Amino acid sequence: MAGELPIATPLPTSPLAMEYLNDFDLMKFDVKKEPLGGRPDRAIRQCNRLQPTGSVSSTPISTPCSSVPSSPSFSPTEHKTHLDDLYWMSSSSYQHVSPEALNLTPEDAVEALIGQHQMPPQLQGYESFRAHHHHHHQNQHQYQGVHHEEMGLPHHHPHHHQHQHHQTSPSPSGSSSSSQQLHHQQQHSSSSAVEDRFSDDQLVSMTVRELNRHLRGFTKDDVIRLKQKRRTLKNRGYAQSCRYKRVQQKHNLEGEKTQLVQQVEQLKQEVSRLARERDAYKIKCEKLANNNSSNFREAGSTSDNPSSPEFFM
């Protein structure tokens, strides 16, 4: 209908209700201003009109039909959801509508639904008019888990009160996370104080007996943490020394290898020189042997000749 317009209600906490509100589009409705009087038959038809099963009218009725809303059907075996509570609260609160609430625009209704703290001027009179009635239903359906200190606060506005409830009411997960963070901060401060007392060099250089004597009076967790740090530092020092020794040994082996390669080259050169000398001596020996054999032949031929002077002597 053109004259119907949804009125802002506090946002529910049920996921199903939030999904319903997110999927509901208010921009498709038009606002038509018309006088309140002169159409009593229209108000009667609105009171007698039946709504479909499972649907909830999100528009206010211009003329209140009854001061007491119709109570929903109750069944012992029926599980009442938060969405049904929302429907019942919405239908009961819309019975008392101020005439000023009809001068609204879709933008004002959207701003009221998304939870703006600055309410439109048209809604302020309506909200102050139904504050007490809405506070009664909110105490029945939504504020069962609120502490007594929070319930004692003055109720200025239903929407503001709901935001304050969500901001100030401590949840179990939030309290547990805050206590865990405080515990971790205390542990970190105590461990940092113990670790700052001893330097890394002192932890490594001290013996176990000296360390136990210095750790008297500390908690068990601090002692275990400090000993674990000392063990880590010693293992790190051992690893660094082993790495240094390994690198140094590698350099030494590489230097020895270079020297041995040079010595091998020198020995090869010496062998080649000796081989050349051997060949030269062998050639010289062969030449001497050939000369001796030729001289011996010449001497033998002269001794066999009878005409030589030596033959007669």
Swiss-Prot record:
Any GO BP: regulation of DNA-templated transcription
Gene3D superfamilies xref list: 1.20.5.170
Major site of localization recorded for this protein: nucleus
Biased amino acid composition, Low complexity: 55-76, 167-192
Entry superkingdom: Eukaryota
This protein's record includes keyword Transcription regulation: yes
GO molecular function terms noted in the UniProt entry: DNA-binding transcription factor activity, RNA polymerase II-specific; RNA polymerase II cis-regulatory region sequence-specific DNA binding
GO CC terms of this entry: nucleus
Residue span of region Disordered: 51-77, 151-197, 292-313
Region (Basic motif): 225-250
Comp. bias (Basic residues): 154-166
Pfam families documented for this protein: bZIP_Maf, Maf_N
Compartments (UniProt record): Nucleus
Entry keywords, A to Z: Activator, DNA-binding, Nucleus, Repressor, Transcription, Transcription regulation
InterPro entries for the chain: bZIP, bZIP_Maf, bZIP_sf, Maf_TF_N, TF_DNA-bd_sf, Transcription_factor_Maf_fam
Keyword Transcription regulation listed: yes
Residues forming coiled coils: none
Stored PROSITE patterns: BZIP (PS50217)
Subunit: Homodimer or heterodimer with other bHLH-Zip transcription factors. Binds DNA as a homodimer or a heterodimer.
Family: Belongs to the bZIP family. Maf subfamily.
Biological function: Acts as a transcriptional activator or repressor. Implicated in the regulation of cell-type specific gene expression and play a role in inductive events during lens development.
The protein's name in its UniProt record: Transcription factor MafB
Biological source species: Xenopus laevis
Phylogenetic lineage: Eukaryota, Metazoa, Chordata, Craniata, Vertebrata
Name of the gene encoding the protein in the UniProt record: mafb
